[in-house]
């Protein structure tokens, strides 16, 4: 979409959220309904850096992302349906795809069991530059939601890269948690199997004694 063309909608309603971060690392929500080119430019001037999180299932997202001034390759990567982890560099901008658990709305993130019900994965497309983090996904993603909660809760992030690192760390922690849960469940299954076997051996022994 050429930058001179007017968008057929106001603001950026295809954004899930948008934050402006100050030099001290504190994040402040931006009003996506009024975030047009003028307000976006003003936000970039007023804040050290921005985090824009898009919903790629929204048909308006390609037009909105096209107005961010990113290269064609980075724009295509953000909007692609690629389901392979990747990381590329173009100048000072890193972009690619990360894997994450899909998140069900209304589920308590802190108490949810990954190993039992988080069987499907989703894909986070991202581009991170010096003063702009753009992330995009089709479904809500668990680690991204967790980091978003941290931002809303007042956790400070000193750089664009720190937010992306936090998302990756959340996913890694969830994988470790799932592995631990799986190991515990396997131990329980093994204990039940051994108990059943022991019960069978005792029954066999009782039969042999009666036969004797």
Give the positions of each predicted feature.
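Peripheral, non-transmembrane regulatory/ligand-interaction domains of membrane transport proteins
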Residues: 1-212
């Amino acid at each position: 979409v050429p930058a001179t063309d007017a968008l057929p909608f106001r603001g950026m309603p295809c954004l899930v959220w948008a934050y402006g971060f100050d030099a001290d690392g504190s994040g402040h929500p931006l009003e996506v309904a009024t975030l047009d080119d003028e307000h976006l430019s003003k936000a970039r001037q007023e804040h050290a850096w921005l985090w824009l999180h898009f919903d790629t299932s929204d048909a308006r997202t390609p037009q909105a992302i096209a107005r961010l001034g990113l290269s064609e390759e980075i724009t295509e990567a953000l909007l692609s349906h690629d389901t392979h982890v990747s990381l590329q560099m173009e100048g000072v901008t890193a972009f690619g795809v990360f894997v994450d658990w899909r998140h069900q709305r209304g589920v308590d993130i802190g108490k949810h069991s990954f190993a039992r019900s988080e069987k499907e994965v989703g894909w986070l497309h991202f581009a991170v530059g010096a003063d702009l983090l753009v992330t995009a996904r089709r479904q809500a993603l668990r680690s991204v939601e967790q980091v978003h909660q941290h931002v809303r809760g007042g956790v400070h992030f000193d750089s664009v890269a720190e937010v992306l690192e936090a998302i990756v760390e959340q996913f890694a922690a969830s994988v470790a948690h799932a592995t631990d849960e799986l190991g515990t469940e396997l131990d329980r299954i093994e204990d039940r199997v051994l108990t059943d076997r022991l019960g069978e051996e005792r029954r066999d022994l009782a039969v042999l004694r009666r036969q004797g």
